[in-house]
Amino acid sequence: MALFTINRYLGEEEEEDSEKQSRSKALLAKLQKQVKARGQQSVSNTPKEEEEQQDDKEHKKRKHKLQETKGKIKKSESVQNTDPTEEADSSVKKKKKRKKSLSTEDVIVKIEENESENEKSVDITGPTPSSPVQFKAEKAEELTSSSQSNYQVLGGFKEKDVQKVKRVLPQWLSQPDVIQKDIKSNLIPISEVPGICPTLLRKLQTNGIQSFFPVQAEVIPAILESVGSGLLVGPGGYRPRDVCVSAPTGSGKTLAFVIPVVQALSKRVVRQVRALAVLPTKELAQQVSNVFSAYTEGSSLKVVMITGQKSFAAEQTALSEIRGGVSHSMADIVVATPGRLVDHINKNSSFSLQHLRFLIIDEADRMIDSMHQSWLSQVTKAVYSTPGETHTSVFRRTVPGPITAASLSPPQIPLQKLLFSATLTQNPEKLQLLDLHQPRLFSSTHSLTDNPAQSQDTFHFPQGLSEYYVPCTFSKKPLIILHFLLRLKFSPALCFTNSREGAHRLYLLVKLFGGVEVAEFSSKLSPGERQKTLKDFEKGKIPLLISTDAAARGIDINGVKCVINYDAPQYIRTYIHRVGRTARAGKAGLAFTFLLKVQEKRFLKMVSDAGSPGIQKQHVHPEALKSMESRYEQVLAELGTIVKEENEKKRF
């Protein structure tokens, strides 16, 4: 026994028990009335059915009594075995269990007890329900509904359509300055574009340019407007807006920034690095450097390229020289790759970006992806570092903050970013890395806010491009390429693979097969070898060039009539840049993609979602390849031997 008795307040529970008893009595009276009503309406049962019902009721009563006796015995045994200290808690738990709703078995037992009482008060010989099981089920339903009447039943809600969440883009992204896609029908004479100086107009005519493409006609005046007040200040003394350009490959983006930058720097007096163009590959940097050199020829402006093709010391000499113990810049415009640029910022003390006015980022989507090198943050740090200058220096630069009267006095040289890409991202996390200032977007598509389901990247396909996909098996891919070159005469053709090893194996296979000149273009080759290969391909000496994505990104290769995706690209950006090597400057071009059966569904959906004007199916009948199969099998055996020998050489 417990040492102290604890009287617990159980008033609410006792009140609930009394309420339940009164409720059951009312329900019993209601059931009796229903039995009388049904007895008057239904047809009287036969004596045999009545006997069966009576036997069924007695059987259930005996079964119920047996269960009750067993339960009492178990309870008595459990009470004897329990500790005295647990008696108070167990009694409270028993009372709490009474609050639970009645189970269906208990309800049926109550119905049977009510029926036995009804037999005494109701004439059994009268008509009863047609089925005792149906009668019990109805009673059970009534009892359960009455026992749960105190609880609020949830449900009955109308299904509503889920409202889609629309992306909310910044105004500069959602409302860009629209550029016409059709190049041929929107050519503008160079004399009609305002702001270009006569010297550059003559230079353009000398280089055979009589008209500007739509991108050039829109972007050149916008950049020239930002330098209308000179290099030291922006329009009205404010910092100029950054410029972003999203246009198809081959639409003339390079000339769109070369012309205004050269004109803006043509009036400079002291030579300093005032324009920096950063590009992802050495070949693309070489191409941009050549364009800058073509339009600075005959002027005092100097263009220097730092991509690692020369030694670090040679590049250091080209960038600056020491005269009278003082370092002097030898470059006005620097064209660089990110890795080499970071090397000069950290290791070349005479390399200064303190006077930088234009930061040009070409192939901006790929440059954003390479931010892990932190090249942009290091460039910004180098621009606003002022070693050896006092706080009262006229040309000192500080990191720009909020626009206030104090921050604008005294004025400082602004840094303007110029971004160019065929696949400009709309991902806010990536754009945040660029730290753009009130950017102005020039795009060949309209606002994207009307289509919230569209991806976060905007893609532009060349106007004259015809796209096809070729269903095939893995073993038939080389045969189809040979069929295209030898039978259909699709040349010059640029073929893309997903790996450097794949490009090399395909190159060896086509070379062993014979009948067509082939070359490979990958990072495996030296810069000199790649430059020579490109020149031979442009001259028509090589009808088939097999390349990787990294090597050919953004390069303007003249005369490419056909692009073949030997390996299907995994990402839409890769596909856009591959097919962008043809159909450039408004010309026509073909693009073929070899697809395995498992790749078709995903690839076609990816291209369709990106806004492709339409990709068609191109069948290659097996009969067209049979004549080459015997020679192809011999070549495969030879290829296996050559690859094995090359792998053995790599080990030693």
UniProtKB/Swiss-Prot annotation:
Helicase ATP-binding domain ranges (all copies): 234-442
Similarity annotation: Belongs to the DEAD box helicase family. DDX51/DBP6 subfamily.
InterPro entries linked to this entry: DEAD/DEAH_box_helicase_dom, Helicase_ATP-bd, Helicase_C-like, P-loop_NTPase, RNA-helicase_DEAD-box_CS
PROSITE patterns assigned: DEAD_ATP_HELICASE (PS00039), HELICASE_ATP_BIND_1 (PS51192), HELICASE_CTER (PS51194)
Domain remark text: The Q motif is unique to and characteristic of the DEAD box family of RNA helicases and controls ATP binding and hydrolysis.
Domain of life: Eukaryota
Record's catalysed reaction(s): ATP + H2O = ADP + phosphate + H(+)
Name this polypeptide is given: ATP-dependent RNA helicase DDX51
Single GO MF annotation: ATP hydrolysis activity
Cell location: Nucleus, Nucleolus
Positions of ATP binding: A247, P248, T249, G250, S251, G252, K253, T254
SMART domains recorded: DEXDc, HELICc
Record's compositionally biased regions (Basic and acidic residues): 66-77, 107-122
Chief localization: nucleus
Keywords, ordered alphabetically: ATP-binding, Helicase, Hydrolase, Nucleotide-binding, Nucleus, Ribosome biogenesis, RNA-binding, rRNA processing
Tagged with keyword Lipid biosynthesis: no
Organism: Danio rerio (Zebrafish)
Compositional bias segments (type: Low complexity): 25-34
